[in-house]
Design a protein with these regions (language model features):
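Catalytic beta/alpha-barrel core
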Residues: 1-14, 21-37, 43-49, 53-56, ...
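Glycine-rich phosphate-binding active-site loops on the catalytic face of alpha/beta enzymes
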Residues: 5-13, 46-58, 92-122
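Catalytic cores of alpha/beta
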Residues: 12-13, 29-43, 72-79, 83-101, ...
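Glycine-centered helix-coil hinge/cap
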Residues: 18, 62-64, 111
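A generic structural signal for alpha->beta connector loops
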Residues: 19-20, 74
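Substrate-recognition "cap/lid" segment bordering the active-site pocket of phosphatases
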Residues: 56-62, 67
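Extended, intrinsically disordered, low-complexity segments
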Residues: 125-132
Length: 132
């Protein structure tokens, strides 16, 4: 279950759905929103949009802000927004636990399966670079 800032609180979602569901919270690029989500026992947090995107009418976040507080994060984090085959590897210094993709998956000229395969190869490359 993924919650935006205008949705129910994480603690409310946990009460309704119990422990059988993971609950994540969008934090834009705010360490304060991250701390609030952590206090409410979020299972993960999401930061974004990492790049300009057609899915959200929001300006992209400053990834340098995430870099500054990344070492303090105790929850897994997702980068979301505008991530595509061309810009994915530029996120390697952030080492996100997960990425969320929409448009670059569904709108890929070769179709979503080919896009997913390409992402899988890029993610292997990203993981290998981070393990070095």
């Amino acid at each position: 279950i993924h919650l935006g800032q205008n949705d129910k609180s994480c603690s409310e979602a946990k009460k309704v759905f119990g422990k059988n569901f993971l609950v994540g919270v969008s934090c834009s690029n705010s360490y304060d929103l991250y701390k609030k989500a952590k206090e409410e026992s979020a299972d993960y947090v999401a930061f974004g949009p990492a790049f300009n995107t057609d899915s959200k009418n929001k300006e992209k976040i400053d990834l340098n802000i995430i870099r500054k507080f990344k070492s303090k994060l105790k929850l897994p984090f997702v980068l979301i927004g505008g991530i595509n085959h061309k810009n994915l590897l530029s996120l390697k210094s952030l080492s996100p636990n997960y990425i969320a993709i929409i448009n670059s998956l569904w709108n890929f000229k070769g179709g979503p399966i080919e896009s997913a395969k390409k992402f899988r190869e890029l993610l292997k490359e990203l993981k290998n670079e981070n393990d070095s």
